[in-house]
Amino acid sequence: MRRRRLQLRYSSDEEEEDETGTSGVGDSVQSFGIASSIQPETSVSSNSNPNPGERIAISEVEIIDVFGNPQPTPPDSSIPTPYPVYPSESVSGNDYESPISEVLSRMGIKLKREWWVSCLSGLETSIPQFSYLDVAAKAKHCFEQFMFFDMNLCGGGVLPPNVASMNRIELAGPFVLQVDEIVNIGCPLKGRYENANAGLKRCLKLSMTDGVQRVFGMEYRPIKDLQVLAPAGLKIVVSSVQVRHGLLMLVPEIVEVLGGMVEELEEARKRLVVEVNKPPRGKRTRVGVVPSLTTRATLAAWSLNGNDTGNHVHDTGNHVNSSASGNASHTQANQGIPVHVTRTHNSSRAMDEPLASTNVGATVSRVEHMQIDTASAHGERTFSDIHSTSSNIHRAASTAGTGTSCSGACSGARSFANNVGGNSLDQTSNVTSFVEEMHIDTGRVRDTTTHIYGSDSGGVAAEFSNMVVDLEGPSVLSTNTEKPFTYLAELSQKWAVMKDTIHFVQGRIKCFLTGVKKFQFKQQSTYELLCYVDDGSLICEILLHNDVVQKRIGHSSMEVTAALSSSAPTSLNAMMKEKLKRFQLFLADFEGIMVVEMNRSSQYPVAIEMNQGCSLTDARLLLDRIKSSSRTSSSLNPVVVLSP
């Protein structure tokens, strides 16, 4: 008896054959109605149905896709076996045979026995009278549950073995696969996780699994239904796919997106995208060792869950035996990210806590981590930190002494708390977008809440109050206007608090450039140069003013455009290119003082002046500031409070 294979054909040259040779098998499968997007249309030989126009009612037994010859039914048997088991089939421990699994297997879904047992028991508990539903309804509920399960854990393997070693082979399918990761290989690593429309400039690479082996697919022609930022764990169905050197060549005709996602993989993908899209951080670390971007991305994706210990990828050729996290790490490893990653880091712990890793642990432990949060998280943290700071100042001042001498310090602390707390309540949701990280460390304030002894309680209280404001209070209240430089975090905090009352704030920042995000000057009257600047407290985007750029280049943007527009090489063209090259080297080597202005008209802080290096005057001012701070701290008697 000739065996029959059920196939999904999406090729345009085979649709005409299906219109003339479709039998009742396709109609029977479509009657299940599990998902409108994956109703198969099968074709069989013409001798099985001499009248193509007539529908043949075929029972569910006859459409089971089997391998090998079925065992003949005894002639004296009046009742056929509803779901026969054929001797040619090798039933493994993970296979699960039931009418429901047969329905999903015809669509290209093969799942493990453990998943079926768990899913059916859960549905019987959650859905009333689930056991009385027909096979189609039960299969529909199981399919809905499957869409949000991780095939790395529940997949039984629907692909033929050793796909990675195949070449010039067409796999008929259909195969339902889970997409763990999508990257745009038409861009460098920094741009691979940015959304891009389907077109000739985009080439997606998909890391997919059927639960047993990892396969990769390439977007051979633009597929509009696939997106770079699609959720991890997306389910797709492929059929009649060409394999070239182990790579699935994906075209729109053979790919259909079903949907779904896996929550754990999606959270890891989001953390990875945030890490990759962060601005450059420069090359400064404690020991001068800078981890690669792929290493940082891997740690960002899988080092935040302290409960997942020991999950790693054990690569055995084409087969992957791991958990969901391991397969996702394997997915990233094929994009240049290390394979063996153990997730042991807890997000609530300090960032300098050592991370556990099998391959990159030695490197990562030497890295100075710099956490850069989003603007919304910054707003909430700033609000809470300001309140905790003001409350600590109030407690510190209240312990300095009693009587009229302490009342001045306490009232000053209360006014500071009310001022900062009230303004921060209104400004929490309006924190400037370019501020990515701002920490107000309250630990040092709490250290000053010990008892202070001295002969003059009033003088000590006033001196103590000044010290607290100098350490932790914002520079808004500082009376020293002759500072050698300030910090971006401090200046950003000042602008966030006072932008409703003043038009702009300025500050001198000692910093260096870590990269250039955008430089435009053609066909416009001004330069637009957006740089990444790091001053040790914050990394943010700063816009260099047109006058600053024009002063360094020596020509306006229109003059540069006119000199570079000539196709023939001239002396003016060569001179302009040389000046632009010198300006590029100046930006690459810049480390000095910037005068930064924050105002309402600009989205970014504007650098209105920049000077290479640090002057001797600034060094003397900084030295005097350090000496005055040391004299203030030395006038207080250090008291060590030992716990009982």
UniProtKB/Swiss-Prot annotation:
Naturally occurring in which organism (per UniProt): Arabidopsis thaliana (Mouse-ear cress)
Region (Disordered): 1-54
Record's keyword terms, sorted: Meiosis
Compositional bias segments (type: Polar residues): 28-51
Secretion signal span: none
UniProt GO BP: resolution of meiotic recombination intermediates
Keyword Kinase: no
Protein's name in the database: RecQ-mediated genome instability protein 1
Disruption phenotype: sterile due to extensive chromosome breakage in meiosis I.
InterPro entries linked: RMI1_C, RMI1_N, RMI1_N_C_sf, RMI1_OB
Quaternary organization: Component of the RMI complex, containing at least TOP3A and RMI1. The RMI complex interacts with RECQL4A.
Family: Belongs to the RMI1 family.
A molecular function GO annotation: nucleotide binding
Source organism superkingdom: Eukaryota
Task of the protein: Essential component of the RMI complex, a complex that plays an important role in the resolution step of homologous recombination, in a process called Holliday Junction dissolution, to limit DNA crossover formation in cells. Together with TOP3A, is essential for the resolution of meiotic recombination intermediates, a step that prevents entanglement of the parental chromosomes.
